[in-house]
From Swiss-Prot:
Function: Necessary for signaling by class 3 semaphorins and subsequent remodeling of the cytoskeleton. Plays a role in axon guidance. During the axon guidance process, acts downstream of SEMA3A to promote FLNA dissociation from F-actin which results in the rearrangement of the actin cytoskeleton and the collapse of the growth cone. Involved in invasive growth and cell migration. May participate in cytokinesis.
Subunit details: Homotetramer, and heterotetramer with DPYSL2, DPYSL3, DPYSL4 or DPYSL5. Interacts with PLXNA1. Interacts with FLNA (via calponin-homology (CH) domain 1 and filamin repeat 24); the interaction alters FLNA ternary structure and thus promotes FLNA dissociation from F-actin.
Family the entry assigns: Belongs to the metallo-dependent hydrolases superfamily. Hydantoinase/dihydropyrimidinase family.
SUPFAM superfamilies named among the record's database cross-references: Composite domain of metallo-dependent hydrolases (SSF51338), Metallo-dependent hydrolases (SSF51556)
Post-translational modification as stated in the protein's UniProt record: Phosphorylation at Ser-522 enhances CRMP1-mediated alteration of FLNA ternary structure and FLNA dissociation from F-actin.
Biased composition (Low complexity): 509-525
GO BP terms, alphabetized: negative regulation of neuron projection development; regulation of postsynapse assembly; semaphorin-plexin signaling pathway
PANTHER family recorded: DIHYDROPYRIMIDINASE-RELATED PROTEIN 1, HYDRANTOINASE/DIHYDROPYRIMIDINASE FAMILY MEMBER
Region entry Disordered, spans: 509-572
The entry's keywords: Cell projection, Cytoplasm, Cytoskeleton, Nitration, Phosphoprotein
Compartments it resides in: Cytoplasm; Cytoplasm, Cytoskeleton, Microtubule organizing center, Centrosome; Cytoplasm, Cytoskeleton, Spindle; Cell projection, Growth cone
UniProt name for this protein: Dihydropyrimidinase-related protein 1
Modified positions (Phosphothreonine) in chain numbering: 101-102, 509
Length: 572
């Protein structure tokens, strides 16, 4: 199949489908009903539906009917050192559908200094010709340059982009200073955008990387050692603090550690509009693998922020996800082949970062959260689909089983056992970080745009059948609260009378005083310290004085100062 320029192929005609005998699960309710799909939309929900003849019927047999998953954190063609991640939009979205995800939001990652608009069009074209499922695009702001504001305005107003990621890490590449973050947050709030933050302290990471390499540590364990969770937590705190001063919502991507999650949870209790997104990897595995004797296995887990070496972290993050302190699960899907990872075989800083998870995400969440009793089925729908749809202004078109919503539907079997393995996954990489994990919960049937794309373990898709889904700015789930808070908590000056008292006249000083020569450059000339030395003075008495005829007193030794004798070594 050939593609010239923009996608010219017709979308596959949607089937008329009737899902009968299922239990519909939304984020806020569960009930038994039939669902009729036509023209890519949910047309009817209820019992004893009247439908046209020739409709294909799917017997759900009491199983769960849930909204298709939405993965808002993928990197399907991320550049790294002249390479791109192993899964393109065809292979990546094919894997997503096999796991029950029917929409992704991928990251556009421009080269620093390059045009955001040009990069967006490049990603858009690649996704439009290859994607198997619906998609949208974040645009990462990799540098804050002249003209970036105009491009951001065009992306929001004309291109259907309402979310942008900024970086606090990757010094001398993507990293922004605090003042740039403040400037970017302020401008993006005015556009009604969702601000995503990669939160790590890039300055300290750069110092730690240098120190650890100098110690002779070059393997994947150096990646974790140079990025301790304190550096993630500090950056999360700083991002929330900056956003709080501006009263703008902030979304922390890839929450990987207990410390970072705790800061988000505490901040939400105090009021800031902050959202946290753990990924499948941080919920399903840990960073102990960085110390594996098998270099290729250890390198497979390299991602940033790194997975926590604390093996209790996944369970802890799952608990916070279940209680609402964290709200969305992504995958951070950005796998590189073992050969690509091996570019950093002698230097951990050169290992391209990224893990798999686009296919495993929903199964991992079900197994770790619902099958353990931490989370109910409605919360599962919320953290895998609905919350993302609300935050990124896709709701209720996506993220809900309702009349008028897109016909992106999954029949989910909570009891089906699945063993995750690279031998059967849809990704092109030869490893899987969840290798051998036995999980409860898996999709039986996946429907995208009203068409069955996955059934009985078989996937049926074609390149380019996915659609670009534009997103409008100012999502109500976020900005309704922003508007109210601006009115209620706006800054106001104090009404007071004018001060009419004396004003001290400060002598004018030059803005840039010439520095005094250092002792090293003028060793023969003593330089007085910058503060007044009471033992040095050019004051002298000369000439006749009024008391010259008075007899002089001899010196007296003061035995005890006023207030009595003191001893600095005694507190008594």
């Amino acid at each position: 199949m050939s593609h010239q320029g923009k996608k010219s192929i017709p979308h596959i005609t949607s089937d008329r489908l009737l899902i009968r005998g299922g239990r519909i699960i939304n984020d806020d309710q569960s009930f038994y009903a039939d669902v009729y799909l036509e023209d890519g939309l949910i047309k009817q929900i209820g019992e004893n539906l009247i439908v046209p003849g020739g409709v294909k019927t799917i017997e759900a047999n009491g199983r769960m009917v849930i909204p298709g998953g939405i993965d808002v954190n993928t990197y399907l063609q991320k550049p790294s050192q002249g390479m791109t991640s192993a899964d393109d939009f065809f292979q990546g979205t094919k894997a997503a559908l096999a796991g029950g995800t029917t929409m992704i939001i991928d990251h556009v990652v421009p080269e620093p200094g390059s045009s955001l608009l040009t990069s967006f069009e490049k990603w858009h074209e690649a996704a439009d010709t290859k994607s198997c499922c619906d998609y949208s695009l974040h645009v990462d702001i990799t540098s804050w340059y002249d003209g970036v504001r105009e491009e951001l305005e065009v992306l929001v107003q004309d291109k259907g982009v309402n979310s942008f990621q900024v970086y606090m890490a990757y010094k001398d590449l993507y990293q922004m200073s605090d003042s740039q973050l403040y400037e970017a947050f302020t401008f993006l709030k005015g556009l009604g955008a969702v601000i995503l933050v990669h939160a790590e302290n890039g300055d300290l990471i750069a110092q730690e990387q240098k120190r650890i390499l100098e110690m002779g540590i070059t393997g994947p364990e150096g990646h974790a050692l140079s990025r301790p969770e304190e550096l993630e937590a500090e950056a999360v705190f700083r991002a929330i603090a900056i956003a709080g001063r501006i009263n703008c919502p902030v979304y922390i991507t890839k929450v990987m550690s207990k410390s970072a999650a705790d800061i988000i949870a505490l901040a939400r209790k105090k009021g800031p509009l902050v959202f946290g997104e753990p990924i499948a990897a941080s919920l399903g595995t840990d960073g102990t693998h960085y110390w594996s004797k098998n270099w290729a296995k250890a390198a497979a887990f390299v991602t940033s922020p790194p997975l926590s070496p604390d093996p209790t972290t996944p369970d802890y993050l799952t608990s916070l996800l279940a209680c609402g302190d964290l709200q969305v699960t992504g995958s951070g899907h950005c796998p590189y082949s073992t050969a690509q990872k091996a570019v950093g075989k002698d230097n951990f800083t050169l290992i391209p970062e990224g893990v798999n998870g686009i296919e495993e995400r929903m199964t991992v969440v079900w197994d770790k959260a619902v099958a353990t009793g931490k989370m109910d089925e409605n919360q599962f729908v919320a953290v895998t689909s609905t919350n993302a749809a609300k935050i990124f202004n896709l709701y209720p078109r996506k993220g809900r089983i309702a009349v008028g919503s897109d016909a992106d539907v999954v029949i989910w079997d909570p009891d089906k056992m699945k063993t995750i393995t690279a031998k059967s996954h849809k990704s092109t990489v030869e490893y899987n970080i969840f290798e051998g994990m036995e999980c409860h919960g898996s999709p039986l049937v996946v429907i995208s745009q009203g068409k069955i794309v996955f059934e009985d373990g078989n996937i049926s898709v074609s390149k380019g059948m996915g659609r670009f889904i534009p997103r409008k700015p100012f999502p109500e789930h976020l900005y309704q609260r922003v508007r109210i808070r601006s009115k209620v908590f706006g800054l106001h000056s104090v009404s007071r009378g004018m001060y009419d008292g004396p004003v001290y006249e400060v002598p004018a000083t030059p803005k840039h005083a010439a520095p005094a020569p250092s002792a090293k450059s003028s060793p023969s000339k003593h330089q007085p310290p910058p503060i007044r030395n009471l033992h040095q003075s050019n004051f002298s008495l000369s000439g006749a004085q009024i008391d010259d005829n008075n007899p002089r007193r001899t010196g007296h030794r003061i035995v005890a100062p006023p207030g009595g004798r003191s001893n600095i070594t005694s507190l008594g």
